[in-house]
């Protein structure tokens, strides 16, 4: 595996490249251009500036998260072809900079959802929580206000305020889009973009829906083994793959995470992975924990063993961490707990590797 660490850039992150460079085993960062409006082409010049900044710190830039998909593409509007052409050009530019994997998602309106960005845990740390009862009791506008107030001035990925200004209008448009129509729109997008990925040797990796069920009546289509497999078969190319986010898929206890890793891993379709843990608190409700197995509801040893069993050589990053030791940072993306998560992942990998060599 290749261990990487998400970084939001000098303008948007409290974590520095120098700090990331000092985390044992981390080879590169997962980056993006956050000032380019969704749907516009990422200029090669700006991509190269980011690459040079990262490489100057002794790290690699081979994974991008995310090149967001314009809402018109998800809705299947007549304007989608222009945005798809822009997406294809962005992939070509990223390939010229040496990028190997592009993460994206196909979630309508909201890229992810939490109901509390600063849940206090008994040890004094802060984490993010999702309580489905609260979703059922508020309007989208009220929830956006709550998230904006809890962001502490940081721009949260997928919650860029310019994207949410037309919220009511966007919700009206989605009244005509059910899960089947959204899936058709995803296939339309992939059929046009994947050939460019093949041409440029850039793998496209869809991120599962977070959480993996419908919210506010919006359709969700990347939530379990069955619909992921359907998506992969619809455009059957090794360049059409997934970002295996165990936190997103693992929010549904019916998803067998190690089994899914083995299944899709043997197909060669896991191009990128997010590893984190969470604790179930009720039906469709959870909060995010530190990475170790005893902290949450998932067995990280079995998760990492599944990756090792398939001979995974792709990219893995520690996902959301708690805010600990008084750190003030973007919710889920401070330095310390994610660094602890990175070393935990690395330690599990080393232990599994040595056990196999010794006893097999």
UniProtKB/Swiss-Prot annotation:
InterPro entries: Man_deHydtase (IPR004628), Xyl_isomerase-like_sf (IPR036237)
Gene3D superfamilies: Divalent-metal-dependent TIM barrel enzymes (3.20.20.150)
Catalytic activity, reaction form: D-mannonate = 2-dehydro-3-deoxy-D-gluconate + H2O
Coiled-coil region list: none
Keyword annotations of the record: Iron, Lyase, Manganese
Cofactor: Fe(2+); Mn(2+)
Gene Ontology biological process terms, A to Z: D-glucuronate catabolic process
SUPFAM superfamilies: Xylose isomerase-like (SSF51658)
MF term (GO), any: manganese ion binding
Pathway: Carbohydrate metabolism; pentose and glucuronate interconversion
Enzyme Commission number, as recorded: 4.2.1.8
Function: Catalyzes the dehydration of D-mannonate.
Similarity comment: family membership: Belongs to the mannonate dehydratase family.
PANTHER family, per the entry: MANNONATE DEHYDRATASE (PTHR30387:SF2)
HAMAP family cross-referenced by the UniProt entry: UxuA (MF_00106)
This protein's name: Mannonate dehydratase
């Amino acid at each position: 595996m290749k261990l990487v660490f998400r970084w939001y850039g000098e303008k948007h992150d409290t974590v520095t490249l120098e700090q990331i460079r000092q985390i044992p085993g981390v080879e590169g960062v997962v980056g993006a251009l956050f000032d380019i409006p969704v749907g516009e082409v990422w200029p090669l010049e700006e991509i190269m500036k980011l690459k040079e900044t990262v490489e100057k710190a002794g790290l690699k830039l081979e994974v991008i998260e995310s090149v967001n998909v314009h809402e018109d593409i998800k809705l299947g509007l007549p304007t989608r072809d222009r945005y798809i052409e822009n997406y294809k050009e962005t992939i070509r530019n990223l390939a010229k900079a040496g990028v190997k994997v592009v993460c994206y998602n196909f979630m309508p309106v909201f890229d992810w959802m939490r109901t509390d960005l600063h849940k206090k845990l008994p040890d004094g740390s802060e984490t993010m929580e999702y309580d489905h009862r609260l979703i059922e009791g508020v309007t989208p506008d009220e929830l956006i206000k709550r998230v904006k107030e809890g962001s502490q001035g940081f721009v949260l990925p997928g919650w860029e305020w310019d994207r949410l200004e037309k919220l009511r209008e966007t919700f009206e448009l989605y009244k005509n889009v059910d899960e089947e129509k959204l899936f058709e729109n995803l296939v339309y997008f992939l059929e046009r973009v994947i050939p460019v990925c093949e041409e440029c040797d850039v793998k496209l990796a869809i991120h599962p829906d977070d959480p993996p069920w419908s919210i506010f009546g919006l359709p969700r289509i990347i939530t379990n083994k069955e619909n992921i497999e359907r998506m992969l078969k619809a455009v059957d190319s090794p360049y059409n793959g997934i970002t295996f986010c165990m936190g997103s898929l693992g929010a549904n206890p019916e998803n067998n995470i190690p089994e899914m890793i083995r299944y899709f891993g043997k197909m060669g379709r896991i191009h990128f992975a997010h590893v984190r843990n969470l604790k179930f608190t009720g039906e469709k409700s959870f909060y995010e924990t530190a990475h170790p197995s005893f902290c949450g509801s998932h067995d990280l040893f079995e998760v990492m063993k599944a990756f090792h069993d398939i001979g995974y050589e792709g990219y893995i990053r520690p996902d959301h961490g708690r805010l600990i030791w008084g750190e003030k940072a973007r919710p889920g993306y401070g330095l310390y707990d994610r660094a602890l998560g990175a070393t935990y992942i690395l330690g599990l990998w080393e232990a599994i590797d040595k056990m196999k060599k010794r006893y097999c």
